[in-house]
Amino acid sequence: MREQLEALRDEALQLVNQASTQKELNDVRVKYLGKKGPITEVLRGMGKLSAEERPVVGEIANAVRSVIQTELEQRLVDVKQQEMDAKLALEAIDVTLPGRPKQVGQAHLLQQVTDEIEDIFVGLGYTIAEGPEVEQDLFNFEMLNLPKDHPARDMQDSFYITDEILMRTHTSPVQARTMLASKGEPIRILCPGKVYRRDEDDATHSHQFMQVEGLVVGEEISMADLKGTLEAFVKQMFGEAREIRLRPSFFPFTEPSVEVDVSCFKCGGKGCNICKQTGWIEILGAGMVHPHVLEMAEYDSTKMSGFAFGMGIERIAMLKYGVDDIRHFYTNDVRFSEQF
């Protein structure tokens, strides 16, 4: 019996050493140590042995079982390590290879310019005001001194939904709403947003574009305050070397009204193709709030005055970044957008 058990031990240990996978090791364990294995059979048959043989055979069988189990466990550790080494070698990454950069999204140029304009005016004490894009005729026209027969109300110029509802043509309705809600108190607001007009799309016009308007109402507000505000804005937006000039103009909601020009970025005022040899580039319209507008918003025009200004965000972006076609902003061409 001793020789038989030792032969089983040697046979099992040989197979253990030859095994190269966890499955092969498990097969050896089942074959020799399983419920139907030869060593288990020996232990089960000990009842047939004499009293003198039983302890001797039991000791030998348990020793053989222990040796095989120990070798299986040790070999299993080695096989697992070998399998891991092989897997790592197969999946090895060369850390010296150049990485693959991931494209990261960013704010659209119009959003960047809007944020910059807002930051400038918030720094001057303004608050941001917003309103609906689908607007009442009352706020879009009537409260801005644009009576029913005014040319700007022509159906060809505006997107009307009903006789009294339209897509706003400017962000001025936000000013009217804010003045009404302020109940005669001083205000200083900036109104950015989308506006809509019945324009043919071309290099400089779009049926939808972005506008930002500013409004200040208070006691003893003067044209000098307007000029100083716009000078501060232009220098922060376009550089300290820029100057502005005011030209007389007409807007129904301001009196007096002005067009505001900035000294040319390219030639510094000497004259070039960008400024059409004038040395100046038009950037926005402005003026003192018309007394009728103040009165319709329930302000006392004998005590309160104010100024307003408005500019196209696309135009500011085109001038600052040298964009030659407004349609570039809306074509979703990554080659254009990623430049900014």
UniProtKB/Swiss-Prot annotation:
Binding-site residues for Mg(2+), renumbered to this chain: 255
Cofactor: Mg(2+)
EC number: 6.1.1.20
Keyword list, A-Z: Aminoacyl-tRNA synthetase, ATP-binding, Cytoplasm, Ligase, Magnesium, Metal-binding, Nucleotide-binding, Protein biosynthesis
Xref: Pfam families: Phe_tRNA-synt_N, tRNA-synt_2d
InterPro entries listed in its UniProt record: aa-tRNA-synth_II (IPR006195), aa-tRNA-synth_II/BPL/LPL (IPR045864), Phe-tRNA-synth_IIc_asu (IPR004529), Phe-tRNA_ligase_II_N (IPR004188), Phe_tRNA_ligase_alpha1_bac (IPR022911), Phenylalanyl-tRNA_Synthase (IPR002319), tRNA-bd_arm (IPR010978)
Keyword Repressor: no
Cellular compartments per GO CC: cytoplasm
Subcellular locations according to the entry: Cytoplasm
Note on cofactor: Binds 2 magnesium ions per tetramer.
Example GO molecular function: magnesium ion binding
GO biological process terms on file: phenylalanyl-tRNA aminoacylation
SUPFAM superfamilies named in the record: Class II aaRS and biotin synthetases, tRNA-binding arm
Subunit-level organization: Tetramer of two alpha and two beta subunits.
Family from the record: Belongs to the class-II aminoacyl-tRNA synthetase family. Phe-tRNA synthetase alpha subunit type 1 subfamily.
UniProt protein name: Phenylalanine--tRNA ligase alpha subunit
Species name: Exiguobacterium sibiricum (strain DSM 17290 / CCUG 55495 / CIP 109462 / JCM 13490 / 255-15)
Taxonomic classification: Bacteria, Bacillati, Bacillota, Bacilli, Bacillales
